[in-house]
Amino acid sequence: MFINEYGGRDDPTIVLLAPMMVSGSDLYGMMKPHFKGRYHVVAPDQGAHGRAGAYVSPDEEYRALKQFLTETGCTRIALVYGASLGVAVGYRLFLDPAFEVERAWFDGVALARNARFAEWFMKRMFRSRKKTLAKTCAEASPSLVKMYGYDFAKMMTRNFERITIEDIDNICRACCHYDLRKLTDDEQRRLHLDFGEKDFDWKYSRKTVPVYMPKAELVIRPGYPHCAYMAAEPKAYVEQIEAFMGREASCC
């Protein structure tokens, strides 16, 4: 993990944890123009992305993030944001009693204890796409363009070029295994869950959300695939995040 830090530490702290094929600096660059408030933003490049080393495990990633936040005195977090891969670390931060996390926004996560088929399928898919990319040297993967548009797909393709097969295996494992427990009412009222209607991760989470976090705020984006709403509508997306941060919490 490589820590990217923006803004002054006297402002409310936001932690941005990006999905696979998006670095922390990429995610910050996408969101920054649309934030209306002033924030201290911590946007790490997770393993295999940006200026970070290899991706080993979410525990290894979280140790690095926790060390940075603790050493810099950033123990009160206004928002932890995680998308897809980023939720593996964000979930740990949200539930760590060492921190006071006011809000959490998680997008496109397979909330499952052991999604073995999803892990196998993802590994196979990304390995195949890696081989195809090596042969074609495409500037933007056609499959990603179809889901996210050309500019976003170009950025993702650039990041994918440096991800190794070992990184793929470790990332897919991280995305498919969560230590789930029933969240308290207080934890649920501070949590927002976001999914595209066509998101394959929603197929897993739709079974576990009613069991472990039924009172969390839940939004399903009609017609969108995995993490695609954030790419298509970044301005509206960030506005909704800030509205959630400022909303009076309620379990009702």
What are these regions (language model features)?
Residues 187, 193-195:
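Short beta-strand/loop motif that positions the catalytic acidic residue
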Residues 115-117, 132-185:
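Conserved alpha/beta-hydrolase catalytic His-Asp/Glu region
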Residues 2-51:
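Conserved HGGG/HGGXW glycine-rich cap/lid loop of the alpha/beta-hydrolase fold
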Residues 82-86, 90:
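Gly/Ala-rich beta-loop-alpha elbow adjacent to hydrolase catalytic centers
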Residues 42-79:
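Active-site loop/oxyanion-hole signature of alpha/beta-hydrolase fold enzymes
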Residues 200-206:
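Conserved alpha/beta-hydrolase "acid-adjacent" motif
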Residues 91, 95-96, 101-132:
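Flexible "cap/lid" loop of the alpha/beta hydrolase fold
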Residues 224-238:
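Catalytic histidine-centered segment of alpha/beta-hydrolase-like enzymes
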